[in-house]
């Protein structure tokens, strides 16, 4: 099951406590022993409800979500400094499986859940454009989805066929099980039919391989792209926050928090989940290079 949070107020408990304190103050005119006892109880309850959280929140999965998780972790630490967020970059498939088998509090996936991935719920916290990257010296500036399909399946093998210099196209992709690979292949309709020259285990490795080879083409998360490679337009549309959010850029996918349907999250895990899915996290997500869904 997939869902998209529109807004959560993870500090609602604090608001409730403040309201309770205000009501207690209004009733302070009655100075009986019973009133004093009630006020003391209210104060204790308020202190308990706003007590700082502690403990660990175990997350893991998508390697493409590394920058987003790092930013969210840093922002959350300003609110709950005694909570530790761990992150194990094992790939989207492993993240979903680990949420299902209760190994992780929150699994991370850079693709939507599949029909057979049951017992868990996916919550979209951000969107990510999958940038099509070429070497900075390449003359190619734009490719269509159909051209990408033909290139990655081996129907088009020379750069001259798509406006580049003469030279055999070198296809660089991610390893099987990668959420980025799954997203790219699903969107471009090349599932399990790509003729990769290299299958690499991390987004950074793909970027480095394309940077080093003037004949290479690959794909990588928008949030990870720097100035060492060139992102081509797809169908004339640049891969950017605006085009991902408005849907005009075709090669995009969600960043998903995956939780187990049969487990109640710990207080600290729920607080981190709510923070990540709230408007308070929008600037952090944007700083990490992804597109926030809640603003």
Positions of predicted regions on the chain:
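Hydrophobic helical h-region of N-terminal Sec-dependent signal peptides
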Residues: 15-19
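Exported/periplasmic ABC-transporter solute-binding proteins
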Residues: 3-5, 27-103, 107-295
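N-terminal export leaders
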Residues: 7-11
């Amino acid at each position: 099951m997939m869902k998209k949070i529109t807004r959560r107020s993870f500090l609602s408990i604090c608001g409730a406590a403040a309201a309770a304190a205000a009501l207690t103050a209004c009733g302070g005119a009655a100075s009986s022993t019973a009133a004093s006892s009630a006020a003391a109880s209210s104060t204790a309850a308020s202190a308990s409800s706003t007590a700082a959280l502690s403990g660990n929140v175990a997350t893991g999965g998508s390697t493409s979500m590394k920058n987003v998780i790092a930013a969210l972790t840093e922002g959350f630490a300003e609110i709950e400094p005694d909570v530790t967020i761990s992150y194990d970059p094992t790939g989207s498939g492993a993240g979903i499986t680990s949420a299902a088998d209760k190994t992780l509090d929150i699994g991370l996936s850079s693709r939507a859940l599949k029909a057979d991935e049951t017992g868990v719920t996916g919550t979209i916290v951000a969107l990510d454009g999958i940038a099509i990257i070429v070497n900075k010296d390449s003359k190619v500036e734009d490719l269509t989805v159909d051209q990408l399909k033909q290139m990655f399946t081996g129907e088009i093998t020379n750069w001259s066929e798509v406006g580049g210099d003469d030279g055999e196209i070198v296809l660089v992709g991610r390893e099987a099980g990668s959420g980025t690979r799954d997203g790219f292949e699903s969107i471009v309709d090349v599932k399990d039919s790509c003729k990769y020259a290299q299958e690499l285990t991390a987004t950074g490795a793909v970027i480095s391989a394309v940077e080093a080879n003037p004949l290479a083409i690959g794909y990588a998360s928008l949030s990870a792209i720097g100035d060492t490679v060139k992102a081509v337009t797809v169908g004339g549309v640049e891969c950017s926050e605006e085009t991902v959010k408005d849907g005009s850029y075709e090669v995009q996918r969600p960043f998903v928090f995956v939780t187990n349907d049969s487990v109640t999250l710990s207080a600290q895990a729920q607080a981190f989940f709510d923070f990540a899915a709230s408007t308070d996290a929008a600037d952090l997500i944007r700083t990490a290079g992804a597109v926030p869904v809640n603003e």
